[in-house]
A protein has these predicted regions:
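Local beta-strand/beta-hairpin segments that build beta-sheet-rich folds
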Residues: 1-6, 76
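SH3/SH3-like beta-barrel superfamily modules
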Residues: 4-48
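SH3-family beta-barrel domains
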Residues: 7, 22-25, 55-57, 125-127
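Boundary regions of SH3-family modules and the immediately adjacent low-complexity/disordered segments
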Residues: 32-60, 71, 77, 83
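Exported/periplasmic cell-wall-interacting domains
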Residues: 35, 48-56, 85-94, 101-179
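Short beta-strand segments
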Residues: 40-42, 77-79, 93-95, 131-133
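Gly/Thr-rich phosphate-binding beta-strand-loop-beta motif of the actin/hexokinase/Hsp70
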Residues: 67
């Protein structure tokens, strides 16, 4: 695992799932990896990383077509979203934000894309990438009404909504995609 993301060159920030201290006193962290299969984990030495607490969490309800942002367990933002089509469903599980990418003004992904550690369960390549799932804006050909299922697995948020989400979250923020 490289210390920098390949797309942005920013430091990698991973979600810590567990912590163990060995009898030798050495501490290890179980982290969620941004690779296949979904849910892949690894143990890394705590002494090799900088830890920070993150009070935020994102939950995406597939049934309600809703993205909610929580701060210390309290909902601070709720937005309707469009999700994956039947043939390319949005995967369920515990993930994390891997990268925050500011898109160019003309991008159909809207102003921001929040790449997740999640990957499509059916697409192993998409648009030249590894089939990574993202929370992103929606304009032009990708615009879709909340409550619909037109995407290749990504979570499409209206542009005004993604602008509200972005300042609340950071790489490493947990993202739970639930039924």
């Amino acid at each position: 695992l490289a210390p920098w993301t390949s797309d942005t060159g920013n430091p990698v920030e991973l979600l810590v799932l567990d912590h163990k201290t060995l009898s030798t006193g050495e501490s290890w962290l179980k982290v969620l990896l941004p690779s296949r299969p979904n849910g892949a984990t690894a143990w890394i030495r705590e002494s090799n990383v900088i830890l920070r607490k993150n009070p935020m969490r994102v939950e995406i309800s597939l049934r309600r077509h809703e993205l909610r942002v929580f701060r210390r367990g309290h909902v601070v933002l709720t937005i309707g979203v469009a999700l994956g089509a039947a043939a390319t469903p949005t995967p369920k599980g515990r993930f994390a934000i891997y990268q925050k990418i500011r898109e160019v003004w003309w991008s159909p992904l809207g102003p921001w894309a929040l790449h997740l550690t999640a990957h499509s369960n059916v697409l192993f390549e998409y648009a030249g990438g590894p089939g990574r799932v993202a929370i992103h804006g929606a304009r032009g050909v990708l615009w879709a009404a909340a409550g619909t299922n037109p995407s290749h697995g990504c979570i499409r948020v209206p542009d005004p909504g993604i602008r509200k989400v972005v300042p609340l979250v950071s790489p490493g923020t947990p993202v739970d995609i639930v039924a």
